[in-house]
């Protein structure tokens, strides 16, 4: 079990940007997000979409792995964050006072094989060296789905090489020190674009095989709001979802602007962002009934395969009441 202090420890480098003073009658809100989160939160930031919904918003871009960002919410340094869904559930059961208020993007993960590693099937990974950021939701999700869909354990049946952040995995693959990596967009797309790796399996395909669900979108990134802030400002849940909806409209309706924003925040080459944009499974917003049903299945799988421990994940009514917040 990865305990809370293990995966949320670490420092934080914030690049805080006060939003423009537009229609700020609802008060202040601090929204932080991952630099490589790939959730359209960049668009909320650069277009100040929370400002359009009446908030005086301060946006912070957080580099690296998700742990330090989650720690910022737990310590109330920020009011809301984007976060991988599995880590959100883990933090909740470990006592972090948070609620899931909406979703941001469908699963982004993939297993990328080194081009000359001789891997053509997921089963070929047995006994091979695989790099992963072990504390991330992508690793745990893909491990659970591989267990359920293929019957073998990536953590036990391969040689896991632990990385601290996505760029480390890219370096390991480039040096041929590993045969494959378990990562997420846009890192996966950058590796493929450079010709160093090929897609062995995408997380969405692993999900469909493991669950037998041909429709619906499992979620990689969701929005979390600290309970204290949410209690005092319940309207933030609706407004954050509306801002995300606006961002998704820009993502699909104005792709050139979306790519420009993402490139500015991630600092990735334009051609990488363009490929990752095309490979994105689905940008999402809100918390509709059918999405909640899919999220509950995700939680059940993570409980079944040991990442989550609490009995709450076996009780859909409690999940809806205590973990989600629907405006």
Located regions from the model:
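Conserved C-terminal helix/tail region of periplasmic/extracytoplasmic solute-binding proteins
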Residues: 300-327
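Secondary-structure end/capping motifs
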Residues: 231-307
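Secretory targeting signals
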Residues: 1-2
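N-terminal export signals
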Residues: 6-23
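Short, surface-exposed acidic
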Residues: 153-159, 266-277, 309-316
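Pocket-lining segment of extracytoplasmic ligand-binding domains
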Residues: 86-87, 168-171, 175-261
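Short, glycine-/small- and polar/acidic-enriched structural segments
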Residues: 24-163, 179-185, 196, 201
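Short, solvent-exposed loop/beta-turn-alpha elements that line the ligand-binding surface or hinge
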Residues: 52-53, 204-216, 282-291
């Amino acid at each position: 079990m990865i305990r809370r202090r293990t995966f949320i420890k670490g420092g934080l480098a914030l690049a805080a940007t006060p939003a423009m003073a537009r229609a700020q009658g609802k008060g202040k809100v601090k929204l932080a997000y991952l630099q490589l989160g790939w959730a359209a939160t960049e668009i909320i930031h650069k277009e100040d979409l929370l400002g359009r919904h009446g908030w005086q918003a301060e946006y912070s871009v957080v580099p690296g792995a998700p742990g330090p960002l989650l720690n910022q919410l737990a310590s109330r340094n920020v009011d809301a964050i984007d976060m991988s869904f599995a880590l959100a559930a883990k933090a909740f059961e470990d006592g972090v006072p948070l609620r899931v208020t909406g979703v941001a993007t469908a699963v982004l993960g993939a297993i990328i094989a080194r081009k000359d590693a001789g891997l053509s099937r997921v089963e070929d990974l047995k006994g091979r060296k695989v790099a992963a950021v072990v504390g991330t939701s992508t690793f745990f999700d893909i491990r659970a789905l591989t267990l359920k869909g293929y019957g073998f354990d990536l953590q036990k049946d391969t040689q896991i090489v632990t990385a601290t952040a996505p760029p480390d995995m890219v370096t390991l693959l480039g040096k041929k020190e590993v045969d494959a990596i378990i990562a997420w967009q846009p890192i996966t797309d950058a590796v493929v674009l450079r010709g160093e790796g090929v897609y062995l399996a995408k997380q969405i395909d692993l999900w469909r095989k493991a669950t037998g669900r041909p429709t619906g979108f499992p979620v990689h990134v969701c929005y979390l709001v600290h309970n204290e802030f949410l209690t005092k400002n319940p309207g933030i849940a609706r407004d954050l979802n509306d801002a995300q909806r606006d961002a998704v409209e820009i993502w699909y309706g104005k792709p050139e602007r979306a790519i420009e924003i993402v490139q500015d925040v991630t600092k990735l080459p334009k051609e990488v962002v363009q490929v990752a944009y095309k490979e994105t499974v689905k940008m999402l917003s809100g918390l509709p009934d059918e999405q909640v049903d899919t999220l509950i299945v995700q939680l059940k799988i993570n409980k079944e395969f040991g990442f989550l421990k609490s009995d709450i994940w076996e009780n859909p009514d409690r999940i809806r009441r205590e973990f989600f917040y629907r405006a």
